[in-house]
Regions:
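N-terminal chloroplast transit peptides
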Residues: 1-31
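Cys/His-clustered metal-coordination modules, chiefly Zn-binding fingers
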Residues: 247-349
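Residue-level detector of intrinsically disordered, flexible termini
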Residues: 18-19, 42-43, 162
Length: 349
C-alpha cells in the first residue's frame, strides 16, 4: 500500500520505492566467477548522506494490544556498500537494496543459524537477483547484471519492475539441523519487490503483512536513504486494529524518505503503529551488516569451484596465466590461487 512520496523532483534525482499490503480481508495491492585476467576489481568506496540516522539497524516490536508485529530496517550504509561492491547502476542499486532489505525483514530474529534466501528469476535485463540473510542481520546479494538501468517510469521513478521482469520468486529457509530446507515460490507479481514479497507471505506462508521497502539516490547517485518495514497481522487481530492499520499506513512517508530525514528504525516502527502504541517490553534490535564472506569460507568454496573445472582445464589455465583468479559473486572479492594450491584442491576430488 503506497503512502506519500515526499520527493521533490528538483532536489532528488532518483527515488525507488516498493510497498504493499495484504490484509486479512484481501486488501488490494497498491503500491562464483572464475576469471582469466590479471586485472583486479576493487569495490568502490562510497559515502552515505543522511541527516541523523548514523547507524543501520533492524528493530522489532509489537503493538501495545499485541495484535501486530512490526520489523523496521534502516540500511543506508549496507545498501551503499552493496552498490559499491557490485558497481551497480541506479535501477540495479534500487533492486539490490530492496531485495536485501526484504531478506532482512524475512530472516532477522529467526532461530539460531537459520538463513533465508530470496531469489527473483525474472526475464528482465537484471537477470537473477538473490539475497541471503541470517538471524543475526547479516545479508549479502548477487545480481546477474548490475548495469541494468531501464528508462524511468512515467512518474519519474526508477523502473525496478521492468528491470526484474516476469518470472518466479522463490524463498528458501534453511537450518543446519533441518533435513531439508523449506522452499516456497510464487509468480513475480510486479517485480517491484515488496508487492511480490507480500504475495509470497500470503500465499506460501499464510501470513498477512504490510510491507514497504525503498532506496533513495541523490543526483550524484549516492545512496541517501534505504529502509523498509513489515507489519505482520497476528491471527487474533481485531477488526478495529485492521481498520486503523489500513487507514494509517497510507499517510506515512516511504521508508527511504523517513530514513533520509534521519528517523531511526525504532522511530519508524513507532510511526507505523501510531495511536496503537508500542509494547516496548518485547522490543529487540540487530545491527545489519553486508556479508559475511570470510576468507576461510571463500577459499574453500572457490577451490571447490576451481576443482570442478577438472584437472585438464585447470592446468591449462595455470600453464597460460600462471594462476587462477576467482571472484565471489556475493562480495566481489578476488582470490588468486597458484599451481600448488590448485593441485591440492584437485587431489581432494
Amino acid at each position: 500500500m503506497g503512502g506519500k512520496d515526499g520527493t521533490n523532483s528538483r532536489e532528488m534525482m532518483m527515488c525507488s520505492r516498493s510497498a504493499a499490503v495484504v490484509g486479512r480481508r484481501q486488501v488490494v495491492l497498491r503500491t562464483t566467477t572464475i576469471q582469466r585476467t590479471t586485472t583486479k576489481r576493487r569495490a568502490a568506496t562510497l559515502t552515505t548522506k543522511n541527516n541523523g540516522n548514523k547507524d543501520d539497524e533492524v528493530y522489532r516490536v509489537m503493538s501495545k494490544n499485541q495484535e501486530l508485529s512490526v520489523i523496521s530496517v534502516t540500511a543506508t550504509k549496507m545498501i551503499a556498500e552493496a552498490q559499491g561492491r557490485h558497481k551497480a547502476a541506479p535501477t540495479a542499486t534500487a533492486a539490490i537494496g530492496r531485495n536485501l532489505i526484504a531478506s532482512l525483514l524475512l530472516g532477522s530474529f529467526k532461530g539460531d543459524e537459520e538463513t533465508v534466501q530470496v531469489t527473483f528469476r525474472g526475464d528482465g535485463p537484471l537477470g537473477q537477483l538473490t539475497a541471503v540473510s541470517d538471524n543475526l542481520g547479516n545479508a549479502k546479494c548477487l545480481v546477474g547484471n548490475a548495469l541494468a538501468d531501464p528508462p524511468l517510469r512515467p512518474d519519474g521513478k526508477l523502473n525496478v519492475g521492468m528491470a526484474v521482469g516476469k518470472g518466479i520468486l522463490s524463498v528458501s529457509r534453511s537450518h543446519p539441523s533441518w533435513v531439508q530446507p523449506y522452499n516456497g515460490q510464487v509468480s513475480i507479481y510486479t517485480g517491484e519487490i515488496a508487492e511480490d514479497i507480500a504475495v509470497y507471505m500470503r500465499d506460501s506462508e499464510q501470513t498477512n503483512s504490510a510491507i514497504s521497502v525503498g532506496v533513495q539516490l541523490d543526483r550524484e547517485l549516492t545512496v541517501v536513504g534505504a529502509g523498509g518495514y513489515m507489519v505482520q497481522v497476528l491471527p487474533f487481530a481485531s477488526d478495529e486494529t485492521l481498520d486503523y492499520l489500513e487507514k494509517h499506513i497510507p499517510t506515512l512517508d516511504s521508508p527511504s524518505t523517513m530514513v533520509e530525514s534521519g528517523m531511526t528504525a525504532e522511530e519508524i516502527a513507532k510511526a507505523i503503529l501510531g495511536d496503537l502504541g508500542a509494547f516496548e517490553e518485547v522490543e529487540t534490535r540487530l545491527t545489519p551488516k553486508y556479508g559475511p564472506c570470510c576468507r576461510e569460507e571463500l577459499e574453500g568454496r572457490m577451490l571447490k569451484a576451481v576443482a570442478s573445472l577438472g584437472r585438464e582445464e585447470a592446468m591449462k589455465i595455470i600453464e597460460e596465466d600462471g594462476k587462477i583468479e576467482v571472484t565471489c559473486e556475493f562480495c566481489k572479492e578476488d582470490l588468486v590461487f597458484n599451481e600448488e594450491e590448485i593441485e591440492k584442491a584437485l587431489q581432494g576430488i
